[in-house]
């Protein structure tokens, strides 16, 4: 692997790590907002869908990953906050 290829690979890894940190921050922020109870159920659902779109913009083609990793957390937070048991 050439030095240029290695530098490009390191840059791509840095960018992916930055995107992942940003996504984690946005997920945590959305969960806090949902758990605050100040939103309607419809607004909470809209936040989740908007965040999913943002996640897919950062990580195209990773719909399944979002649905497996983050959607259950949001469903649990919504169920607990809005007492949907």
Predicted regions mapped to residue ranges:
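N-terminal acidic leader/helix
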Residues: 4-41
């Amino acid at each position: 692997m050439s030095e240029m290829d290695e530098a490009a690979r390191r840059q791509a890894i840095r960018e992916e790590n930055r995107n992942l940190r940003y996504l984690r921050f946005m997920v945590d922020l959305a969960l806090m907002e949902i758990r605050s109870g100040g939103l309607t159920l419809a607004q909470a659902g809209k936040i989740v869908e908007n965040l999913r779109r943002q996640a897919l913009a950062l990580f195209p083609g990773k719909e399944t990953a979002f649905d497996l990793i983050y959607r259950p957390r949001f469903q649990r937070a919504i169920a607990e906050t809005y007492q949907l048991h």
